[in-house]
Design a protein with these regions (language model features):
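Active-site-proximal substrate-binding groove within the catalytic cores of carbohydrate-active enzymes
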Residues: 2-338
């Protein structure tokens, strides 16, 4: 590591950040490791610094990058960095797990979205490092509970989407850890599994983060004694968005305002808020979905879902029929419905 005063000095060189801005004019910039490395001391007699000095210089580097590019973030994240950055990379998850090699079950622990209780409304957070989309069900479920956008790290070589050969899963594990690569009867049917995964997760996590980005986690509940069925509420009163996620290995039964009696498969969820609703469920609003279906609903104007006369419905996989306000709609990919 270069000591902090020299980091800023190097960043200001004409051929460094100023050149990047001149050549490419990015609106956002990421500097690796700045926040990942804790406060350091430097005993060089020419520029000795203590831990607080190290933080001060890293803040100056952050502010400098932010002034140039507009949006700035760094790896991991620090509380002192919150006023000086816009996003943290690595706080939500690491390599498809909760945190590096940490295994919560070995400690008898349950991971909860604690950061979201305090700072969800003032910092965008992502995970980091590669993971396998066909093993990412719990990873996605964790992002749903945290109401955070997903990142996409590992891509096959070359024109991977043109690859031929059988793409069906040879065997479906129980629970289905590859469930978010499903596309049967849905929007991405026949598309490469990675692209299916990107589309499915983006359609859920993108809008979910959009409607909760300025809210904190106001309530967290464990709905079962084994802590596997979890409910998170973002915001308060009529503007709140509620998320219920099943982290268990068996189906879970829940009640929701829009869906009534809902059956969630392992890693399934139901999301309900004034501006967005979604579910990965085996039963929702009186409709049975066999091995599960994934739908999202968004109003097409500034009205809330309950008052909207035009609603976009996205269908990722599973049976194609959804019931809304007493009417049945068959949605293979996506559709804007008119509600009378």
């Amino acid at each position: 590591m270069v000591c902090a005063p020299k980091q800023l000095e190097l960043a200001k060189r004409p051929q460094n950040l100023p050149a990047i801005n001149r050549l490419f004019a990015p609106w956002s910039y990421f500097i690796d490791t700045t926040y990942a490395v804790g406060p350091r001391e430097c005993h060089d007699p020419n520029h000795p610094i203590g831990r607080n000095d190290d933080i001060m210089w890293k803040i100056r580097l952050s502010d400098y990058a932010r002034d140039i590019f507009g949006i700035f973030g760094s790896e991991c994240g620090r509380e002192w960095a919150l006023p000086h950055s816009d996003f943290f990379e690595g706080l939500v998850a690491v390599s498809g797990r909760y945190y590096h090699n940490l295994k919560p079950d070995e400690f008898g622990a349950t991971v909860i979205p604690f950061f979201e209780m305090v700072y969800h409304d003032c910092q965008i957070c992502y995970g980091k490092y590669g993971y396998s989309a066909d093993k990412a069900a719990e990873f996605v479920a964790h992002h749903v509970l945290c109401a955070r956008p997903l990142y996409y790290h590992s891509f096959p070589d070359h024109l991977y989407w043109k690859s031929t050969g059988k793409r069906e899963k040879q065997q479906t594990p129980v629970p289905d850890v590859a469930c978010y690569t499903r596309s049967d009867n849905g929007w991405a049917d026949g598309v490469h599994p990675l692209d299916v995964f990107i589309k499915n997760t983006y359609e859920v996590l993108g809008p979910l983060h959009s409607v909760t980005a300025h809210d904190t986690l106001s309530n967290l509940k464990f709905l079962t004694e084994d802590f596997t069925l979890r409910q998170a509420t973002y915001g308060r009163s009529k503007d709140a968005t509620t998320v219920i996620v099943n982290f268990g290995t068996k189906d879970a039964q829940v009640e929701s305002t829009l869906g009534g009696k809902v059956t969630l498969p392992p890693w399934g969820f139901v999301i309900e808020g004034p501006r967005f609703a979604a579910f990965h469920a085996r039963r929702w609003n009186g409709q049975d979905y066999g091995t599960g279906a994934l739908f999202t609903l968004r109003p097409m104007n500034k009205k809330d879902l309950k008052d909207a006369d035009r609603i976009r419905i996205f269908h990722a996989f599973g049976p194609e029929t959804i019931k809304w306000k007493g009417n049945l709609y068959k949605v293979q990919r996506e559709m804007v419905i008119r509600v009378l």
